[in-house]
Each structure stands twice: as structure tokens, then as C-alpha cells.
Regions:
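Class I SAM-dependent methyltransferase SAM/SAH-binding core
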Residues: 49-95
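SAM-dependent methyltransferase
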Residues: 139-211
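A short acidic, Gly/Pro-enriched loop at the edge of an enzyme's catalytic core
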Residues: 97-104
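Residues lining the SAM
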Residues: 108-110
Length: 231
């Protein structure tokens, strides 16, 4: 599983259009509807901790897991600034370990798509089930194959900011349903730019595949919604 390295430095800059507050409100609303208003919550694939921080601000005792040391360094800086008591763990989400169980697990921003083998997805879901309290809730979002095939596939995204720029090239293999992201990042240092290159892979899953993985993990599907809706 790929970890963000050079991109971590500019991740929040280029993701400043992501509606983290809206996502947090949406996720927290579902948690509260299911009676989870406080207690331990795991943010699986937490990245730089943007949603982790917001959920901590709502009164949840947060744990964040990510496999990128660079991303967690930024998350820790946010934690120091906010004063929130968040535990961050540098772990691969496919093999994460906790000290005990939690009331809920969330995994936002298509983190589960980075697991490119269905067998490993089922194993990850089984781990989630293992660390959930009885009656606990697992909330996650994922990109379907449609998004990779019709929206992202073989497109190039580029942005130029004052202090950094990036080129994001997508190459989608419809047979394997794997989307390759080739990232080229330039970060200003004085009068020059430092260049980073990274390659990441995500898999486009069908709804059937995901529900099968949940069933194999021993979990019950409560609901499946389109983003920001209850439909």
C-alpha cells in the first residue's frame, strides 16, 4: 500500500477545496443517529488529521491510523495547535492494531480504495469488526469503478499555487479496475523549486464486491448512501 511522502508536504494546500466540515457533520450525524455521541472513534487512513481534529472538537476520543509518517507529522502539528488529546498510530490499515475496542470506525476520502486486492479488503474489514464494540458502527466511503472509468480515468489535473504546483496524471486499467496516479510536485525553495514524484494505485470496487467483503468480515450492512445524502 502506497504512503504519501513528498505530497504530504503540500497535501492540505491542494485539498483545501475538500469540504471536511461538511463530511464531518455528515459522519457525525450518522453516528448520533445510531446513539454514538461520544467515546472512542478510530479514523482509519486519517492522513493529515483534518477530520480527526473536527471529530475531536465534537467530543469524540479520537485515534488516527495512517501509513504515512509524513502525513502523521502534519497531523501531530495540528494536534499540538488545537490541544486535542488524539492518539496517532503509524500503521498500515490492512494490519492495524489497537489496545482495545472502539465505538465506531470511520474511513473517509476513499481511503479503502487504496486496498487493491478484494481479499485484503475483506481482511481489513474483519480487523475493523474485531476492534468494534458490540453494536459498534463502521462508516466509510469509497469510489466505485464508475468514477475511475468515466470521471478520473486517463485525465490530467494540474494546479499552480504561489509556493507549490502539481501535475496529477490518471491511467485507468478497465480490465484490472486499477487507477494509477502519477504525481509530480514542485515546491518553491527560495528562487528554485524542489521536485517530487510519486505513484499511487487505487482499485474501483463494485457495490457487490464491497458488500461481499463486509459479509465475509462478519458485519451487517445497515445502509448505503450516495455522498451527503440518505438516498
Amino acid at each position: 500500500m502506497d504512503a504519501y511522502t513528498g505530497f504530504a508536504e503540500v497535501y492540505d494546500t491542494f485539498m483545501d477545496n475538500v469540504p471536511y466540515a461538511e463530511w464531518t457533520e455528515y459522519y457525525a450525524g450518522i453516528l448520533k443517529e445510531n446513539g454514538i455521541r461520544d467515546g472512542l472513534v478510530l479514523d482509519l487512513g486519517c492522513g493529515t488529521g483534518s477530520m480527526t481534529e473536527l471529530l475531536a472538537g465534537l467530543g469524540y476520543d479520537m485515534i488516527g491510523v495512517d501509513n504515512s509518517e509524513e502525513m502523521l507529522e502534519i497531523a501531530s502539528e495540528k494536534k499540538a495547535a488545537s490541544g486535542h488529546d488524539i492518539l496517532y498510530l503509524l500503521q498500515d490499515m490492512r494490519e492495524f492494531e489497537l489496545y482495545g475496542t472502539v465505538r465506531a470506525v470511520i474511513s473517509a476520502c476513499d481511503s479503502v480504495n487504496y486496498i487493491t486486492e478484494p481479499e485484503e479488503l475483506a481482511e481489513t474489514f474483519a480487523l475493523v469488526n474485531n476492534y468494534l464494540d458490540p453494536g459498534g458502527l463502521f462508516l466509510f466511503d469509497f469510489n466505485t469503478e464508475y468514477k475511475y472509468r468515466e470521471i478520473l480515468g486517463d485525465t490530467t489535473i494540474a494546479e499552480n499555487r504561489d509556493e507549490c504546483s502539481f501535475i496529477w496524471e490518471n491511467f485507468y486499467d478497465p480490465q484490472e479496475r486499477i487507477n494509477e496516479y502519477d504525481l509530480t510536485i514542485f515546491v518553491r525553495e527560495g528562487e528554485l523549486y524542489r521536485k517530487f514524484e510519486e505513484t499511487h494505485f487505487q482499485r474501483g470496487y463494485t457495490v457487490r464486491e464491497v458488500t461481499d467483503c463486509l459479509r465475509k468480515a462478519g458485519m451487517e450492512l445497515v445502509a448505503m448512501y450516495d455522498g451527503f445524502t440518505k438516498e
